[in-house]
UniProtKB/Swiss-Prot annotation:
It comes from Hypsibius exemplaris. It is found in: Secreted. InterPro entries: Calycin. Keywords: Secreted, Signal, Stress response. This is Secretory-abundant heat soluble protein 53582. The lineage of its organism: Eukaryota, Metazoa, Ecdysozoa, Tardigrada, Eutardigrada.
Length: 163
């Protein structure tokens, strides 16, 4: 009986420890809130050719939360004014499918030095987006590229949650 309690106690501790979110080890891990600063955003949205309800032409306050939990990374994107939230679970270097409305999107996150890179394919629209997340201090610059069009948005680090 004592062995059972020890096994349950150990399993519970291991399972709990594996479930904790990690916020350190990569510069781009954290919670990032958009600023009002954007460059070439309307041209980027036009190049996507997606409906404006999916990608508004005006810059919306956006929050990116990126953390590691166990062997997986998680990227949560939220746009509070649209009551929109998308959670993506991924492994660096491995393509993953994400449903976004009627579209299945293929994502592959990799690293380029200190930068997080996301290659996004929207097969139903024959579009590819190349995103780069680059951190300097408490500022994250996200560069978006579709075709020859490049846009940028800037984000500031929010206090990381403890769990």
């Amino acid at each position: 009986m004592a062995r059972l309690f020890v096994a349950v106690a150990l399993f519970g501790v291991v399972a709990f420890a594996a479930a904790e979110k990690e916020w350190t080890g990569k510069t781009w891990l954290g919670s990032w809130a958009s600023t009002d600063r954007a460059e070439n955003w309307e041209a980027f949205v036009d190049a996507l050719g997606l409906p404006s309800d999916q990608y508004p032409r005006e810059v919306q306050r956006t929050i990116h939360t990126i953390y590691k939990q166990g062997d997986k990374y998680h990227h949560e994107v939220s746009i509070p004014s649209k009551n929109f939230k998308k959670a993506i679970e991924y492994t660096l270097g491995t393509e993953t499918d994400v449903q976004h409305g009627p579209h299945t999107i293929k994502l592959k996150y990799t690293e380029d030095g200190e930068k997080l890179v996301a290659d996004v394919q929207i097969p139903s629209k024959n579009k590819q987006i190349h995103d780069i997340y680059e951190v300097q201090g408490d500022t994250l610059t996200k560069t978006y590229k579709v075709g020859d069009v490049v846009a940028k948005r800037w984000f500031t680090r929010e206090a990381n949650p403890t769990a």
